[in-house]
Amino acid sequence: MRQTERVNPVQLTPRRLAGLADVPHALPYQGSKRRLAHVIVRLLPADTDRLLEPFAGSAAVSLAARHLKIGGTAWFSDINAPLIGLWQRILDDPYELADTYGRMWVEQRADPAAYFLSVRTEFNEQHAPHHLLYLLARCVKAAVRYNRDGDFNQGVDHRRLGVRPDLMRSRLVRASATLAGSRAGVADYRDVLAWATERDVAYLDPPYEGVSATRDHRYVAGLPRSEFVTAMIAAVASGTSFLASYDGRSGDRVYGEPLPADLGLLHLHLDAGISSQATLNGESAATVESLYVSPALVRRLGGVDEVVGRLAAPGEAARGLVGSAGRPPLCRNVEDACSDVAAPDREFADLP
């Protein structure tokens, strides 16, 4: 049996890091990556050169890592070109973007619903970054939806006017400063994996198999399981350090089958809290997400027990579920941030 093989996934309830409580998230983007970032940063070796995030979305993991100053830089990418265009504006000129958003926020007040529809039409024709920022701030529960032609088609949230201009400015400027020196680009995840060096770490968060077999309106494109497995085989063979969120469960609904055991990946089951998608549908369902750790990264971190030990609660370690002797050090900034947070995470859309 290989070092990273286990018959059953390791079950863990991730602890939140106090040091991530004030990460400046620029984009209101539905999903669980903000919670998972508390896990990912614990698994980044102290010698990490670059964090690669090829399914960027809200770039929550890149923001968390750079907020804690882990690694030299972050390179995040996506095949969603308008989204990357927005991120490039945030990196290059957050003040001008904030000014434009502020003007739009004021202009909408005469007829918010009609203004939203007008901006949505313009965005689908022009793909301007400021249009996308406004739509993300104003759409229902920050839940992005696309039609079969790839056009943004989510409706307006009639309960609110979106993030206030002063607060949006603060988020954009702080996110830009946090990501200083980072790069955003349009790229296929397979190319990103091919660029990785031995001291890089890639975090992959592709559409799950359960939402990729058919056209899912949350993504501009799906991802066939066979393609992703082939990419993982190549990444393992090349010795790439990576983490991948793939299959999972929300309530009774299962998203996809586990990745093949013969890949030799360490399989963790993480309690990700209440599903934001279920909440949007008026339901309450606990979410369990799978996180896979590549053999190369497990070796860099000192072995399976040491990986689990970075994530397990003290009581789990005391019961002998994990080892502790000889554990490679965490990045200093992660150690400083490791006190637990009692208050629950809140979704971006619920913040003032």
Indicate residue ranges for each PLM-predicted region:
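SAM-dependent nucleic-acid methyltransferase catalytic core
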Residues: R2-R42, A46, D93-Y203, P207-R215, ...
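Generic structural hydrophobic/aromatic packing signal, biased to beta-strands
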Residues: W87, L133, F152, A175, ...
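Short aromatic-enriched loop/helix-cap "lid" or pocket-rim segments at secondary-structure transitions
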Residues: L86-R89, V144-R148, Y255-E257
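SAM cofactor-binding core of SAM-dependent methyltransferases
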Residues: D47-R120
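Class I S-adenosyl-L-methionine
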Residues: M1-W75, I79, S182, A187-A196, ...
